[in-house]
Curated annotation (Swiss-Prot):
Name of the coding gene: rpsK
SUPFAM superfamilies, per the entry: Translational machinery components (SSF53137)
Protein's recorded name: Small ribosomal subunit protein uS11
Keyword field contains Ribosomal protein: yes
Coiled-coil ranges per UniProt: none
HAMAP family linked to this entry: Ribosomal_uS11
Subunit structure, interactors included: Part of the 30S ribosomal subunit. Interacts with proteins S7 and S18. Binds to IF-3.
Gene3D superfamilies xrefs: Ribosomal protein S11 (3.30.420.80)
InterPro entries referenced in this protein's UniProt entry, alphabetically: Ribosomal_uS11, Ribosomal_uS11_bac-type, Ribosomal_uS11_CS, Ribosomal_uS11_sf
Keyword RNA-binding belongs to the record: yes
Swiss-Prot/TrEMBL keywords: Ribonucleoprotein, Ribosomal protein, RNA-binding, rRNA-binding
Organism from which the protein derives: Lachnoclostridium phytofermentans (strain ATCC 700394 / DSM 18823 / ISDg) (Clostridium phytofermentans)
Assigned protein family: Belongs to the universal ribosomal protein uS11 family.
Record GO terms (molecular function): rRNA binding; structural constituent of ribosome
Length: 132
C-alpha cells in the first residue's frame, strides 16, 4: 500500500526591488501605446498598454488611453519605490505627451525626456499611402 504524497506547488516568490531611479520607455504607435518602467539597467519593473487595459479599436490610440496605461504602470512601479525616471519616447503616436503628464501626476519626478524614435537612413520602403 503506497501512500499518495500531495505534491506541493512550487511558486517563485515575487521579489520587491527597492529602486528609486529608473527609466520610463513610452512606445507610442499610431494604433497603441505601451509604457514600460525599468530600473537604471533596463530591467522591467512594470508595464501597461492601452490595449491591455481594455481599450479596443480606435480608442486604443487616444491620448486618454495612453494616460491610463501610464498611470497603471506608475502605480505598479511605485510599489518598488520608484521616485525619479528618465523618459525615453519612441514612435509617432498621439499618446506621447499624455503618458509623460500622467507619470508626473502619479508622483514620479521626470528628470529628462529623450526622443529615441528610430529614423531610417533610407532603409525599408514605407507602406503605401492610404486612400479613403
Amino acid at each position: 500500500m503506497a501512500k499518495k504524497i500531495a505534491a506541493k506547488k512550487v511558486t517563485k516568490k515575487r521579489v520587491k526591488k527597492n529602486v528609486d531611479r529608473g527609466q520610463a520607455h513610452i512606445q507610442s504607435s499610431f494604433n497603441n501605446t505601451i509604457v514600460t518602467l525599468t530600473d537604471a539597467e533596463g530591467n522591467a519593473l512594470s508595464w501597461a498598454s492601452a490595449g491591455g487595459l481594455g481599450f479596443r479599436g480606435s480608442r486604443k490610440s487616444t491620448p486618454y488611453a495612453a494616460q491610463m496605461a501610464a498611470e497603471t504602470a506608475a502605480k505598479a512601479a511605485l510599489v518598488h519605490g520608484l521616485k525619479t525616471v528618465e523618459v525615453m519616447v519612441k514612435g509617432p503616436g498621439s499618446g506621447r505627451e499624455a503618458a509623460i503628464r500622467a507619470l508626473q501626476a502619479c508622483g514620479i519626478e521626470v528628470t529628462s525626456i529623450k526622443d529615441v524614435t528610430p529614423v531610417p537612413h533610407n532603409g525599408c520602403r514605407p507602406p503605401k499611402r492610404r486612400r479613403v
